[in-house]
Amino acid sequence: MTLKGCTVAAALVLLASGAPRAATEANFGPNTTGDLVELCTAIPDNAAVNFCEGFAQGAVLVEMQNQVAFRGPKLFCMPNPPPSRNQALSEFVNWARSSPDRLAQSSTDGLFRFLSERSPCPPSL
């Protein structure tokens, strides 16, 4: 094997050990919080990550609009300024993985539970 071949082989071995898992087609519901976590932790530049970001952003925006329209109790109150999308999704993944029962919840229930714990509303809201 040439030096170039050895270098490529060594790089692949090193990358494989710490590489994010590939999301599968079954995760693209996403039916559970675990499915959403798999999508959010896929290899960067993978369609799964884009799906995760779009799903989360869409769900949050719809819920925020519902909170304004129905004027009931709010599930969460976003801080000002809000966290970056990458920061929030990283925190969500860590939160979900910290307790296996969270992974079995529906994807939106898990996301909103995380947000309600991370960004609770003041008692008056």
Write out the residue ranges for each language-model feature.
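N-terminal low-complexity, Pro/Thr/Ser-rich intrinsically disordered segments
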Residues: 24-31
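Positively charged n-region of N-terminal signal peptides that target proteins for export
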Residues: 1-5
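Short N-proximal segments of mature Sec-exported proteins
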Residues: 31-94
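C-terminal partner/receptor-binding element of secreted or periplasmic proteins
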Residues: 103-125
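Sec/Tat signal peptide C-region and signal peptidase I cleavage site
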Residues: 18-24
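Bacterial N-terminal signal peptides
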Residues: 7-17
